[in-house]
């Protein structure tokens, strides 16, 4: 039955929940509104329809639904809930014709937070989707001297040229090196072929 999938997903959610509790971390989805409380956002940039790396979708925009999911987006509510029924119906839809309605999400520091479509993300992650289509708004923080912020601003420059969001660096200069590696001049835009070749190689 379709609830079998839900029960499997629930077990995965419960495992993640227990692991987080054991590490002293929150056992629920991250909430972007909470993260932004002390952040100065200087711009909102609509990115349009984006292929979002599933592993970069880490939370939800508002706190409304965040306790329904573990941090890995697996469900935590019991199988006899309306939530479980809706989740199972999405499974049906995914297996029959695929889930095509893009989610709505916010990007902050190259991580993504869902405004609409938490259950879709949950089902797609359960089926190990690599990318999830979403209409994305980027929230740009004020510049500061932290390493994370400086790397992010390098990413913003790179994204303008490459439109690639699945490469992460932990040191400064990585994106400029990557631009050279793809045989592009500083400031030169990538073509669709560049993107295809790179994703195949990556």
PLM regions and their residue ranges:
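Short, charged/polar connector segments at secondary-structure boundaries
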Residues: 1-109, 115, 126, 171-182
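Solvent-exposed functional surfaces
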Residues: 133, 137-139, 143-202
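A short, basic-hydrophobic beta/loop patch
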Residues: 97-112, 118-151
